[in-house]
Curated annotation (Swiss-Prot):
Gene assigned in the entry: EMB2271
WD repeat placement: 143-182, 204-243, 246-285, 288-326, 328-366, 386-425, 431-471
Organism whose genome encodes this protein: Arabidopsis thaliana (Mouse-ear cress)
Full protein name: U3 snoRNP-associated protein-like EMB2271
Presence of the UniProt keyword Cytoplasm in the record: no
UniProt family annotation: Belongs to the WD repeat RRP9 family.
Basic residues: compositionally biased ranges: 8-17
């Protein structure tokens, strides 16, 4: 595919490759790294008391002066020790186990993790999903006053986050559904955190959120919406810490690069901006879309997938300052997500779902009319419009071929993405009334959460009064 060189995305970066660990199972994919980058395991566990907070500060001070090489070596040793301890606990009753066998288990585990992370091996979760039982259905665990516009899960699947058109940001427990609300600070505090008030009174005082993202280490929550700012929150304290300025339009989508503090934001001004949450700084902006940017997604590599109202889907290769452009022929893109580093899914306003390859300009497989309007959603009783069949959300269970899509037709559909045959196979339909504006799989594949509401995420093109505004969870039984 032709690579279109894009000026203005920013200067190329130069970085050093890690030479600390020569074990092939520990090495990451070769890539140019930015100045601001950190590792998956460099995190601080959330604290509930002041004493635990002080302990965390002491730990930070202890490693404050170590070099990058020392830090990577320490993290690698911690990872090896943790895996060895886990394997030893699993086989502690086996007296005949020797050191060579334990080493082989550690190497096998590291190899599997690296292959899954790079996308070379995927778990067969789609084949493991068992037939649904009568008790298996969506259950609303968190309620909002207005339509939910975004949902996300922490890396350990224990906590969830949701935002809605009512401006509330909720942090909730997956098992119990108990939620806590993030409190917006005063205008003076927001101004001290970098917020620039707009001339428009509506924009200035509107805290309506349309997108959110959670960092892999569970330290930062990013939200964005009508006020044209990207807001950064500390998950440990649930306090507002920074307001990133720079977008001239509504912030419509957010995502973190896996394993880093690098944050991507898409806006109605057509730009894709890059920030560093840990250092709370702006890095650069990527250009290319000629209209509003609607949805973005990213994995571990420095590549960002985006779709916009200009009927294009673009894959930005940030270090090389290049991008690949994929065009929709008959419809507008509504959402997108990565399947792996070389394949991705898109949802359109004509009700179709498409599977794309990085090597081809056209989709390799299309499911037409994926979300047809079912009988219970007739226009008389539920004010159903053509917007009900728009595919407003797609999600993939990371490291597997299990995917899901949502619209306003009354159900969430599960799919199996077959890379070898380049096909999408339908699996199950999960009834859920309302507009499904956001989806997220648990990393284990054991459940699926959906942000649902009476209205679509980015407008008021339809209204389903029978729907409930909130976050719904559906268990998935794997064999």
């Amino acid at each position: 595919m032709k690579l279109e060189k894009k000026k203005g995305i920013g200067a190329k970066r130069r970085g050093k490759k890690s030479s600390i660990d020569h074990d092939p199972f520990l090495e990451e994919e070769t890539e140019k790294r930015r100045k601001f980058n950190y590792d998956d395991d460099d995190d601080i566990e959330s604290v509930e008391s002041e004493e635990e907070g002080k302990v965390g500060e002491e730990v930070e001070d202890e490693f404050a002066h170590e070099t990058v090489g020392e830090k990577r070596k320490r993290l690698a040793e911690d990872t090896l020790n943790r895996i060895e301890e886990a394997k030893q606990r699993e086989h502690e009753e086996d007296n005949e186990e020797d050191d060579d066998f334990r080493d082989s288990l550690v190497a096998k585990t590291l190899m599997q993790e690296q292959l899954e992370k790079s996308g070379r091996v995927r778990r067969a979760n789609a084949l493991r999903v068992q037939d649904l039982q009568s008790s298996d259905k969506f259950r609303v665990i968190v309620k909002h006053q207005h339509s939910v516009t975004g949902v996300a899960l922490s890396d350990d699947d224990s906590r969830g986050f949701s935002v809605s058109k009512d401006g509330t940001i909720l942090h909730w427990d997956v098992s119990s559904g108990k939620s806590d609300e993030y409190k917006w600070p005063s205008d003076e505090v927001l101004k001290s955190h970098g917020l620039k008030f707009q001339e428009s009174w509506y924009t200035r005082h509107n805290k309506q959120s349309l997108a959110l993202a959670v960092s892999s280490d569970g330290r930062y929550l990013a939200t964005g919406g009508v006020d044209c700012h990207v807001h950064l929150w500390d998950i440990r304290t649930r306090e507002h810490v920074q307001a990133f300025t720079g977008h001239c339009g509504i912030v419509s989508s957010l995502c973190f690069r896996e394993g880093t503090a690098e944050l991507f934001s898409g806006s109605y001004d057509g730009t894709l901006s890059i920030w560093n949450a840990e250092h709370r700084t702006y890095i650069e902006s990527c250009f290319g879309h000629q209209s509003e940017l609607l949805s973005i997604d990213a994995l571990g590599r420095e590549r960002v997938l985006s779709v916009g109202r200009d009927r294009t889907m673009q894959l930005y290769k940030v270090p090389e300052s290049t991008r690949l452009i994929y065009r929709a022929s008959e419809s507008n893109f509504e959402c997108c997500c990565f399947v792996n580093s070389d394949e991705f899914l898109s949802g359109s306003d004509n009700g179709s779902i498409a599977l794309w390859s990085i090597l081809k300009k056209k989709p390799v497989f299309i499911v037409n009319n994926a979300h047809h309007v079912i009988a219970d959603h007739d226009s008389v009783n539920h004010n159903c419009t053509p917007a009900c069949s728009w595919v407003s959300s797609v999600a993939v269970c990371r490291g597997s071929e299990l995917a899901a899509s949502g619209a306003g037709n009354g159900c969430v559909r599960l799919w199996g993405v077959e890379s070898g045959s380049s096909a999408i196979q339908p699996l199950y339909e999960l009834p859920l009334p309302g507009f499904v504006n956001s989806l997220a799989f648990a990393k284990s594949g054991r459940f699926l959460i959906a942000g649902v509401g009476q209205e679509p995420r980015l407008g008021r093109w339809g209204c389903l009064k029978s729907a409930q505004n909130g976050v719904a969870i559906h268990p998935l039984r794997l064999s």
